[in-house]
Protein backbone atom coordinates (compact mmCIF):
# COMPACT_ATOMS: atom_id res chain seq x y z
CA UNK A 1 0.00 0.00 0.00
CA UNK A 2 1.28 3.46 -0.89
CA UNK A 3 0.46 6.56 1.17
CA UNK A 4 0.08 9.73 -0.87
CA UNK A 5 1.38 12.81 0.92
CA UNK A 6 0.45 15.75 -1.28
CA UNK A 7 2.92 18.58 -0.69
CA UNK A 8 3.82 17.24 2.72
CA UNK A 9 6.81 19.50 2.78
CA UNK A 10 7.20 21.66 -0.29
CA UNK A 11 10.48 23.19 0.85
CA UNK A 12 10.98 25.96 -1.70
CA UNK A 13 14.07 28.03 -2.21
CA UNK A 14 13.82 31.56 -3.57
CA UNK A 15 17.15 31.95 -5.33
CA UNK A 16 16.85 34.86 -7.69
CA UNK A 17 14.99 37.77 -9.15
CA UNK A 18 13.90 37.88 -12.79
CA UNK A 19 13.89 41.19 -14.58
CA UNK A 20 13.57 41.98 -18.25
CA UNK A 21 11.17 43.08 -20.96
CA UNK A 22 8.16 40.90 -20.37
CA UNK A 23 9.92 37.55 -19.98
CA UNK A 24 12.30 37.64 -17.05
CA UNK A 25 15.42 35.55 -16.72
CA UNK A 26 16.26 34.17 -13.33
CA UNK A 27 19.72 34.73 -11.91
CA UNK A 28 21.17 32.34 -9.34
CA UNK A 29 22.12 33.91 -6.04
CA UNK A 30 25.40 33.12 -4.28
CA UNK A 31 25.15 30.20 -1.86
CA UNK A 32 25.08 32.41 1.23
CA UNK A 33 22.08 34.34 -0.13
CA UNK A 34 19.82 31.35 -0.75
CA UNK A 35 16.34 31.72 0.72
CA UNK A 36 13.94 28.94 1.65
CA UNK A 37 10.15 28.83 1.76
CA UNK A 38 7.96 25.84 2.59
CA UNK A 39 4.18 25.77 2.10
CA UNK A 40 2.07 23.90 4.64
CA UNK A 41 -0.97 21.62 4.34
CA UNK A 42 -3.71 20.75 6.84
CA UNK A 43 -2.80 17.92 9.21
CA UNK A 44 -4.12 16.01 12.18
CA UNK A 45 -1.80 17.74 14.63
CA UNK A 46 -2.34 21.40 13.82
CA UNK A 47 -0.60 24.40 12.30
CA UNK A 48 0.93 27.53 13.75
CA UNK A 49 -0.93 30.55 12.36
CA UNK A 50 -0.07 34.14 13.22
CA UNK A 51 -2.19 37.26 12.60
CA UNK A 52 -0.18 39.52 10.31
CA UNK A 53 -0.78 43.12 9.22
CA UNK A 54 0.38 43.88 5.67
CA UNK A 55 0.64 47.49 4.46
CA UNK A 56 -1.48 48.48 7.47
CA UNK A 57 -4.34 46.14 6.51
CA UNK A 58 -5.49 42.83 7.95
CA UNK A 59 -4.95 40.85 9.99
CA UNK A 60 -4.15 38.06 7.56
CA UNK A 61 -3.65 34.48 8.73
CA UNK A 62 -0.13 33.40 7.82
CA UNK A 63 1.36 30.01 8.63
CA UNK A 64 4.54 30.36 10.70
CA UNK A 65 7.23 28.27 9.03
CA UNK A 66 10.63 27.99 10.69
CA UNK A 67 11.94 26.16 7.61
CA UNK A 68 11.24 29.22 5.44
CA UNK A 69 13.38 32.31 5.32
CA UNK A 70 11.26 33.78 2.53
CA UNK A 71 7.66 34.84 3.17
CA UNK A 72 4.85 34.10 0.71
CA UNK A 73 1.40 35.64 0.22
CA UNK A 74 -1.51 34.40 -1.87
CA UNK A 75 -3.00 36.06 -4.92
CA UNK A 76 -6.12 36.68 -2.82
CA UNK A 77 -4.09 38.91 -0.48
CA UNK A 78 -2.49 40.71 -3.43
CA UNK A 79 -5.96 41.54 -4.74
CA UNK A 80 -7.25 42.59 -1.31
CA UNK A 81 -4.33 45.01 -0.93
CA UNK A 82 -4.73 46.40 -4.44
CA UNK A 83 -1.18 45.45 -5.40
CA UNK A 84 0.01 44.94 -8.96
CA UNK A 85 2.01 41.95 -10.13
CA UNK A 86 4.70 42.76 -12.68
CA UNK A 87 5.54 39.96 -15.14
CA UNK A 88 9.22 40.90 -15.15
CA UNK A 89 9.64 40.43 -11.38
CA UNK A 90 9.80 36.81 -10.32
CA UNK A 91 11.34 34.51 -7.76
CA UNK A 92 12.56 31.04 -8.67
CA UNK A 93 11.32 28.52 -6.11
CA UNK A 94 12.99 25.13 -5.85
CA UNK A 95 10.85 22.41 -4.29
CA UNK A 96 11.42 18.89 -3.06
CA UNK A 97 10.85 17.54 -6.57
CA UNK A 98 11.27 20.51 -8.90
CA UNK A 99 11.35 24.26 -9.35
CA UNK A 100 9.00 26.97 -10.51
CA UNK A 101 9.35 30.68 -11.25
CA UNK A 102 6.55 32.60 -9.50
CA UNK A 103 5.55 36.27 -9.37
CA UNK A 104 6.92 38.52 -6.65
CA UNK A 105 5.60 41.70 -5.12
CA UNK A 106 7.01 44.45 -2.91
CA UNK A 107 5.34 45.09 0.45
CA UNK A 108 5.67 48.38 2.29
CA UNK A 109 5.27 46.77 5.71
CA UNK A 110 4.68 43.35 7.27
CA UNK A 111 4.00 43.31 11.01
CA UNK A 112 3.11 40.78 13.69
CA UNK A 113 4.02 41.26 17.33
CA UNK A 114 7.59 42.51 17.62
CA UNK A 115 8.34 41.61 14.00
CA UNK A 116 8.26 44.71 11.78
CA UNK A 117 9.60 44.47 8.23
CA UNK A 118 9.70 47.23 5.64
CA UNK A 119 10.19 47.24 1.87
CA UNK A 120 9.99 43.46 1.75
CA UNK A 121 9.84 41.38 -1.44
CA UNK A 122 7.68 38.24 -1.15
CA UNK A 123 6.67 35.44 -3.49
CA UNK A 124 3.05 35.12 -4.62
CA UNK A 125 1.21 31.80 -4.95
CA UNK A 126 -2.33 31.05 -6.03
CA UNK A 127 -3.05 29.35 -2.72
CA UNK A 128 -1.33 28.05 0.38
CA UNK A 129 -1.94 24.65 1.91
CA UNK A 130 -4.20 24.88 4.91
CA UNK A 131 -6.23 27.74 3.49
CA UNK A 132 -4.00 30.42 4.97
CA UNK A 133 -3.30 33.84 3.52
CA UNK A 134 0.40 33.15 3.22
CA UNK A 135 3.53 31.77 4.80
CA UNK A 136 5.46 33.73 7.40
CA UNK A 137 9.12 32.91 6.91
CA UNK A 138 11.70 33.71 9.55
CA UNK A 139 13.44 36.52 7.69
CA UNK A 140 13.95 39.26 10.27
CA UNK A 141 13.52 36.98 13.31
CA UNK A 142 16.99 37.71 14.64
CA UNK A 143 16.72 38.63 18.33
CA UNK A 144 13.07 37.55 18.56
CA UNK A 145 11.30 34.94 20.67
CA UNK A 146 8.38 32.92 19.32
CA UNK A 147 6.04 31.35 21.88
CA UNK A 148 3.39 28.85 20.76
CA UNK A 149 0.76 27.67 23.25
CA UNK A 150 -0.93 24.70 21.59
CA UNK A 151 -3.42 24.30 24.44
CA UNK A 152 -4.71 27.89 24.17
CA UNK A 153 -4.10 28.06 20.40
CA UNK A 154 -1.98 31.20 20.73
CA UNK A 155 1.24 32.39 19.14
CA UNK A 156 3.18 35.47 20.24
CA UNK A 157 6.32 37.05 18.79
CA UNK A 158 8.27 39.24 21.21
CA UNK A 159 11.75 40.65 21.67
CA UNK A 160 13.94 38.10 23.41
CA UNK A 161 15.16 39.11 26.84
CA UNK A 162 17.25 35.95 27.12
CA UNK A 163 14.70 34.18 29.32
CA UNK A 164 15.64 30.71 30.49
CA UNK A 165 13.23 27.81 30.24
CA UNK A 166 10.66 27.46 33.01
CA UNK A 167 11.22 24.86 35.74
CA UNK A 168 8.82 22.40 34.07
CA UNK A 169 10.22 22.82 30.55
CA UNK A 170 12.97 21.07 28.64
CA UNK A 171 15.50 22.68 26.33
CA UNK A 172 17.16 21.89 23.00
CA UNK A 173 20.25 23.92 22.03
CA UNK A 174 20.11 25.06 18.40
CA UNK A 175 22.40 26.46 15.76
CA UNK A 176 21.41 28.89 13.02
CA UNK A 177 22.38 27.75 9.54
CA UNK A 178 22.17 30.34 6.72
CA UNK A 179 21.56 32.81 9.56
CA UNK A 180 18.00 31.64 10.27
CA UNK A 181 17.50 27.89 9.77
CA UNK A 182 17.20 26.08 13.12
CA UNK A 183 19.48 23.04 13.28
CA UNK A 184 19.94 20.92 16.41
CA UNK A 185 22.26 18.03 17.23
CA UNK A 186 20.67 14.79 18.31
CA UNK A 187 20.60 11.02 18.09
CA UNK A 188 18.39 8.47 16.38
CA UNK A 189 19.12 5.38 18.40
CA UNK A 190 22.89 5.55 18.64
CA UNK A 191 23.34 7.45 15.39
CA UNK A 192 24.33 11.12 15.59
CA UNK A 193 22.10 13.35 13.46
CA UNK A 194 21.53 16.95 12.46
CA UNK A 195 17.86 17.88 12.78
CA UNK A 196 16.14 20.86 11.14
CA UNK A 197 13.14 22.20 13.09
CA UNK A 198 10.44 22.95 10.52
CA UNK A 199 7.01 24.10 11.69
CA UNK A 200 5.94 24.26 8.04
CA UNK A 201 6.23 20.50 7.49
CA UNK A 202 3.44 18.12 8.43
CA UNK A 203 5.59 15.00 8.51
CA UNK A 204 9.10 14.28 9.75
CA UNK A 205 11.54 13.35 6.97
CA UNK A 206 14.93 11.64 6.97
CA UNK A 207 17.68 11.49 4.37
CA UNK A 208 19.29 8.45 2.78
CA UNK A 209 22.40 8.75 4.94
CA UNK A 210 20.29 8.23 8.06
CA UNK A 211 18.18 5.52 6.43
CA UNK A 212 21.25 3.54 5.42
CA UNK A 213 22.72 3.83 8.89
CA UNK A 214 19.45 2.56 10.39
CA UNK A 215 19.07 -0.32 7.96
CA UNK A 216 22.55 -1.51 8.85
CA UNK A 217 21.00 -2.04 12.28
CA UNK A 218 18.06 -3.90 10.82
CA UNK A 219 17.03 -5.40 14.14
CA UNK A 220 16.12 -1.87 15.27
CA UNK A 221 14.43 -0.63 12.09
CA UNK A 222 11.95 -2.06 9.61
CA UNK A 223 10.55 -0.56 6.41
CA UNK A 224 6.79 -0.28 6.75
CA UNK A 225 5.29 1.35 3.68
CA UNK A 226 5.94 3.27 0.49
CA UNK A 227 5.36 7.01 0.40
CA UNK A 228 4.95 9.48 -2.43
CA UNK A 229 5.73 13.15 -1.91
CA UNK A 230 4.10 15.27 -4.62
CA UNK A 231 5.77 18.60 -5.26
CA UNK A 232 5.85 21.34 -7.87
CA UNK A 233 4.10 20.68 -11.19
CA UNK A 234 2.75 17.41 -9.72
CA UNK A 235 6.22 15.86 -9.97
CA UNK A 236 6.52 13.04 -7.45
CA UNK A 237 9.34 11.73 -5.32
CA UNK A 238 9.31 8.34 -3.65
CA UNK A 239 10.38 7.44 -0.15
CA UNK A 240 9.85 4.79 2.47
CA UNK A 241 8.18 4.92 5.86
CA UNK A 242 10.51 3.34 8.41
CA UNK A 243 9.71 2.68 12.04
CA UNK A 244 12.44 4.70 13.70
CA UNK A 245 14.12 4.09 17.06
CA UNK A 246 13.98 6.73 19.77
CA UNK A 247 14.93 10.22 18.61
CA UNK A 248 16.73 12.30 21.22
CA UNK A 249 17.08 16.05 20.72
CA UNK A 250 18.47 17.83 23.75
CA UNK A 251 16.16 16.91 26.62
CA UNK A 252 13.40 15.71 24.26
CA UNK A 253 12.88 11.99 23.67
CA UNK A 254 10.56 10.97 20.83
CA UNK A 255 9.45 7.35 20.59
CA UNK A 256 7.27 5.35 18.19
CA UNK A 257 7.68 7.65 15.19
CA UNK A 258 7.42 6.56 11.56
CA UNK A 259 9.66 8.75 9.40
CA UNK A 260 9.66 9.10 5.60
CA UNK A 261 13.15 8.48 4.21
CA UNK A 262 14.17 9.44 0.71
CA UNK A 263 16.60 11.31 -1.50
CA UNK A 264 14.84 14.53 -0.49
CA UNK A 265 15.97 17.58 -2.44
CA UNK A 266 15.78 19.93 0.53
CA UNK A 267 18.58 18.08 2.35
CA UNK A 268 20.83 18.77 -0.64
CA UNK A 269 19.86 22.44 -0.62
CA UNK A 270 20.74 22.59 3.07
CA UNK A 271 24.06 20.79 2.58
CA UNK A 272 22.92 17.86 4.73
CA UNK A 273 22.72 15.06 2.16
CA UNK A 274 25.98 13.34 3.16
CA UNK A 275 25.42 13.03 6.91
CA UNK A 276 22.48 11.53 8.83
CA UNK A 277 19.81 14.23 9.05
CA UNK A 278 16.16 14.74 9.93
CA UNK A 279 13.58 17.39 9.17
CA UNK A 280 11.36 17.50 12.28
CA UNK A 281 7.79 18.43 11.37
CA UNK A 282 4.49 19.16 13.06
CA UNK A 283 3.74 15.47 13.68
CA UNK A 284 6.29 15.88 16.48
CA UNK A 285 6.12 19.59 17.34
CA UNK A 286 2.32 19.71 17.38
CA UNK A 287 2.21 17.07 20.11
CA UNK A 288 3.65 19.58 22.59
CA UNK A 289 1.72 21.76 25.01
CA UNK A 290 4.09 24.71 24.61
CA UNK A 291 6.92 25.50 22.21
CA UNK A 292 9.32 28.43 22.49
CA UNK A 293 11.91 29.29 19.86
CA UNK A 294 14.37 31.90 21.12
CA UNK A 295 16.49 33.13 18.24
CA UNK A 296 18.72 35.23 20.49
CA UNK A 297 19.51 32.35 22.85
CA UNK A 298 19.57 29.92 19.90
CA UNK A 299 17.48 27.57 21.99
CA UNK A 300 14.20 25.67 21.80
CA UNK A 301 12.17 25.35 24.97
CA UNK A 302 9.24 22.94 25.32
CA UNK A 303 6.70 21.72 27.85
CA UNK A 304 5.65 18.10 28.31
CA UNK A 305 6.92 14.92 26.77
CA UNK A 306 5.97 14.27 23.17
CA UNK A 307 2.63 12.46 22.98
CA UNK A 308 2.67 10.62 19.68
CA UNK A 309 -0.19 8.40 18.49
What is each residue range found by the language model?
Residues 18-309:
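Pepsin/retropepsin-fold aspartyl endopeptidases
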Residues 6-16:
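Bacterial N-terminal signal peptides
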Residues 1-4:
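Positively charged n-region of N-terminal signal peptides that target proteins for export
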